[in-house]
Amino acid sequence: MIVAGDFKNGVTFELDNNIFQVVEFQHVKPGKGAAFVRTKLKNIITGATVERTFNPTDKMPKAHIERKDMQYLYNDGDLYYFMDVESYEQLPINKETIGNTLDLVKENDIVKILSHKGNVFGIEPPTFVELEVTETDPGFKGDTATGATKPATVETGYVIKVPLFVNTGDIIRIDTRTNEYMERVK
């Protein structure tokens, strides 16, 4: 069981015969009246997002989510193929389930496949990825004082904002949780 007062981002639990993941939460303690927990929840089966308020003492059964390392192989139309790194078994997953989570993942990278009772509902990419910049405007010496950014296309085709000193061919580290530039690796 999980208590609503212990909610954190990413916690999964069962409620009304559905499985929800906490996307945002806020503990509210008004000057008058009882405290409550305001949440934004994602139904991991349907993908719908709902807002719900809980009493901090409300208890829900925790959903047991399986996370399995699999290698992203390739995509063919609306199907993405992954391979179990232990059994070499291939698993096709449709684009609706994946969403935009593979924007920063290259073929042959290892990702975590999320499932509940055998039903795949999502993918968790590595927290940080290192990708090569394939196209961006050239940077000029002395252009870094303002902290300005420019668009850059990385090798997966995703466009990200980078500092002006980043050039085509540079390897950059990106945080996949926020899809933001972290640093230049080389």
From Swiss-Prot:
Keywords: Cytoplasm, Elongation factor, Protein biosynthesis. One of its GO terms (molecular function) is translation elongation factor activity. InterPro entries: Elong-fact-P_C (IPR015365), NA-bd_OB-fold (IPR012340), Rib_uL2_dom2 (IPR014722), Transl_elong_fac_P/YeiP (IPR020599), Transl_elong_KOW-like (IPR013185), Transl_elong_P/YeiP_cen (IPR001059), Transl_elong_P/YeiP_CS (IPR013852), Transl_elongation_fac_P (IPR011768). It is found in: Cytoplasm. It comes from the Bacteria. The keyword Cytoplasm applies. One of its GO terms (biological process) is peptide biosynthetic process. Pathway: Protein biosynthesis; polypeptide chain elongation. It holds the Pfam family Elong-fact-P_C. One of its GO terms (cellular component) is cytoplasm. Signal peptide: none annotated. Involved in peptide bond synthesis. Stimulates efficient translation and peptide-bond synthesis on native or reconstituted 70S ribosomes in vitro. Probably functions indirectly by altering the affinity of the ribosome for aminoacyl-tRNA, thus increasing their reactivity as acceptors for peptidyl transferase. Belongs to the elongation factor P family. This is Elongation factor P.
